[in-house]
């Protein structure tokens, strides 16, 4: 999420865009909704940025953005894509050009129509480096993207690969074949935007004009984001409730207690204090199934002694082998996760637990010490390695345990570095202020390996242009991902993505820890529709109190 940077609850918080703070009820988080209404109240963190689809890559903003904006395609509970705003998405023979026809009659909540230009201008705005949008790299496959990364732009230059044919038709020229493009456009960064956005993007982000199943009622910062049903919505996800109000919490245990008391309806995580008991708690409706979210930590590629060279690779491999993932899952997460074996997830087509280099993710303390000694022979390291995380998200038990394992199993000086809030934490990551390792994770934006790999570790997504927060760069990895995108079949693509992953398993730009279960709780007020979708998020539109 978004999507995005993930929210964490010591157990396995869902992330949709890279990390988002899982919290508990803040003293100013409002309690339940009006008695008898069918408004669903949902747990959330304060978004890092205004609610603009192309600048949202964490779950605090990603959850409301997903419900506010409809894209060309939507995904069902299992991740299957269906046309939504699109009437058709038709490739040419080699999938280097797509002709997209949109359905007539769609309109934004200000009454203006959704047209072909609503998409082409929005995509160009996100791609244009002048506008500094966090999801820019998602558009790197479209012709003209490189031209929009140059200095001296005004911000309104358009992608040359996008051509408007008429009000309901546009074409997309790509830099190379991409058979997965019709799935990618289901990500929120590909949402259309109304003309009012360009007049004042900042003001728009505070009260967006949208086209999705809900529209914004109000955003009371650090308290709640209230969405109400959009009566003009024409798409696939007709809400079975009257709205969703996202309550902002800074203490996830307090949020859980609000679920028990009926003052909050749903949260997509379980605090560490309740992971042993939530499945038998008669005051909540519990959910826990295998999920698609991966939890990791990242060591910046610019960090001395940890760069993408022989010394840095040895140290990263040593750190990874010194971590006993099964013990973390058993003792800290109470069994609500699965040890990571690669960089995607068991829910992703093409997943494998037997890739070359997978041994680097297995606990082996003696091998870890051997690799660390080899790195020291290249250049002695006597520093302290810090592990940063947002203190408002329940991550403390996990990172305390990781630091203790590294001290005991590898004999290095390691320490935690809690940062008070998720917003401060993400700002430090975004501004490249991290001087050590930091917590990361990924909730997929669409169900394909490319989303876990290219969007997180490609050169195109580095340097603030996407979600490559460690600024890892490897041309061989980039090339394999490009070959995979151009493959003629999904099977061929997955084989190439597996080869790309084997490079990551050697270089370890991030250290995979575990796959979070899709776990959460709902209040007893929720009468129907409570389940989790492929992104490890509740099925908000399906939930009802009636």
Residue map of PLM features:
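Surface-exposed binding/hinge segments that line
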Residues: 118, 127, 131-194
């Amino acid at each position: 999420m978004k999507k995005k940077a993930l929210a964490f609850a010591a157990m396995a918080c869902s992330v949709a865009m890279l990390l988002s703070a899982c919290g508990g009820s803040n003293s100013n988080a409002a309690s339940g909704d009006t008695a008898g209404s069918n408004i669903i109240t949902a747990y959330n963190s304060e978004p890092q940025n205004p609610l603009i689809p192309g600048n949202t890559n964490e779950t605090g903003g990603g959850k409301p953005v997903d419900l506010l904006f409809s894209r060309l395609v939507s995904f069902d509970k299992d991740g299957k894509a269906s046309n939504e705003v699109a009437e058709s998405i038709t490739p040419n023979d080699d999938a280097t050009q797509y002709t997209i026809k949109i359905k007539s009659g769609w309109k934004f909540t200000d009454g203006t129509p959704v047209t072909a230009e609503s998409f082409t201008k929005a995509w160009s705005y996100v791609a244009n480096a002048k506008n500094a949008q966090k999801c820019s790299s998602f558009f790197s496959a479209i012709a003209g993207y490189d031209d929009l990364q140059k200095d001296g732009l005004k911000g309104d230059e358009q992608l040359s690969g996008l051509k408007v044919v008429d009000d309901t038709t546009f074409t997309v020229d790509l830099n190379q074949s991409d058979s997965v493009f019709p799935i990618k456009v289901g990500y929120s960064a590909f949402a259309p935007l109304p003309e009012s956005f360009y007049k004042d993007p900042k003001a728009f982000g505070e009260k967006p004009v949208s086209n999705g199943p809900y529209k914004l009622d109000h955003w009371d910062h650090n308290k709640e984001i209230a969405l109400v049903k959009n009566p003009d919505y024409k798409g696939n996800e007709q809400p079975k409730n009257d709205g969703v109000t996202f309550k902002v919490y800074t203490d996830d245990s307090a949020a859980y207690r609000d679920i028990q008391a009926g003052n909050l309806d749903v949260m997509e995580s379980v605090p560490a204090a309740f992971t042993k008991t939530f499945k038998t708690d008669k005051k909540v409706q519990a959910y826990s199934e295998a999920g698609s979210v991966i939890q990791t930590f990242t060591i910046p590629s610019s960090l001395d002694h940890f760069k993408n060279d022989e010394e840095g690779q040895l140290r990263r491999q040593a750190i990874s082998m010194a971590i006993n993932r099964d013990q973390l899952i058993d003792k800290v997460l109470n069994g609500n996760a699965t040890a990571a074996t690669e960089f995607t997830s068991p829910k992703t087509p093409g997943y494998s637990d037997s890739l070359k280099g997978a041994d680097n993710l297995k606990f082996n303390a003696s091998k870890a010490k051997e690799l660390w000694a080899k790195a020291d022979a290249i250049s002695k390291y006597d520093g302290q390695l810090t592990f940063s995380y947002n203190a408002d998200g329940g991550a403390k038990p996990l990172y305390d345990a990781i630091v203790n394992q590294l001290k005991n199993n590898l004999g290095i000086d390691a320490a935690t570095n809690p940062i008070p809030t998720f917003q401060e934490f993400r700002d430090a990551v975004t501004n490249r202020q991290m001087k050590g390792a930091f917590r990361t994770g990924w909730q997929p934006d669409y169900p394909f390996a490319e989303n876990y790999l290219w969007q997180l570790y490609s050169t195109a997504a580095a340097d603030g242009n996407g979600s490559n927060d460690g600024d890892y760069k490897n041309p061989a990895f980039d090339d394999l991902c490009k070959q995979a995108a151009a493959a003629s079949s999904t099977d061929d693509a997955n084989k190439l993505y597996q080869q790309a992953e084997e490079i990551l398993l050697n270089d370890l730009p991030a250290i995979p820890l575990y796959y979070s279960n899709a776990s959460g709780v709902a209040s007893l007020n929720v009468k129907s529709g409570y389940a989790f979708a492929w992104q490890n998020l509740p099925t908000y539109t399906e939930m009802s109190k009636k």
